[in-house]
Amino acid sequence: MQGQFRTYIRKFHVFVDALVAKILGGKTLGQLSEDCKDKMPILDNIDYFAYAKKSHFQQLEIPKIHSKQSPKTADMKAYQDSLILTFIKQNIKPGAKILEIGGGHSRIIQLLHDTYAFWNLDKLEGVGFGPKSPYNAHGHILVQDYIGAFSPELKDHSFDFIYSISTIEHLPEDEETVTRCLADMDRLLAPGGSCLHCVDAILKPDKLEVHPLLQKALSENKTAKTNLSFETISKDADLWKLPFYTYYTRYFHLTKERLKTFGQPITINIYWKRDGI
């Protein structure tokens, strides 16, 4: 029953977002994507994709569920789903083994499970509006555990690609947890395997608040790529931030703070390969 209610709420948001996007005017995400026929390879331009930009929507394949939203109404997952979907299609060979961390009722797995072998590592505790109980894992394998717990259900060096969407920011921030999570990902990645994580961050007037796992990954893996420069991000006119409309319809009831006080939610993308390979 709870899963059905969540599905209903998601569909309701999709309908309302599309309606508001039409009222506000401008092109939808789907139209922006269709306008650009020659997509930019993400991996070859990973520095450009280090954080969410308005111009990215033209370069990404937009899942149908998000196609009628606009940059003025989209939520973080609309951007993050599109980035991960495009990256996988551009860079991961069909049949590859892929692990999503904290996928819940994963939209990416639903779209691509016929082409790739998917696992979803999720404790199912409802974090970030996710499911709280087991579900029918059609087309993939569900493992109910945490990243960093070294689950025996996930074999060493067995995954070609690991990704997460709005998950890393929910992990505990203590040094031990961060170290264990990175070590577990390294354990799970096959030689030459790679990670791409889309992480929610908060841009304040004087600083960037982001989970410490990103900084640790940058300091310990020479292949890690992202941009955590407050100076660069805060002055980028192309920066895409969570829209005013979306903040007040999705998050205000949780934060109980005005957007100006809370800070601007943005997406940071971090990529790396196993063991510096």
Show the residue positions of the predicted features:
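A short acidic, Gly/Pro-enriched loop at the edge of an enzyme's catalytic core
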Residues: 150-162
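Conserved Class I S-adenosyl-L-methionine
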Residues: 206-239
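Class I SAM-dependent methyltransferase Rossmann-like catalytic core
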Residues: 36-91
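Class I SAM-dependent methyltransferase SAM/SAH-binding core
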Residues: 99, 103-150
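A short SAM/SAH-binding and catalytic strip from SAM-dependent methyltransferases
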Residues: 160-175
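Helix-to-beta-strand junctions that scaffold the AdoMet/dcAdoMet cofactor pocket
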Residues: 93, 171-172, 189-191
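A short glycine-rich, Lys/Arg-flanked "PGG" loop and its adjoining helix->strand segment in the class I
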Residues: 176-191
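Conserved beta-strand signature within the Rossmann-like core of class I S-adenosyl-L-methionine
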Residues: 192-200
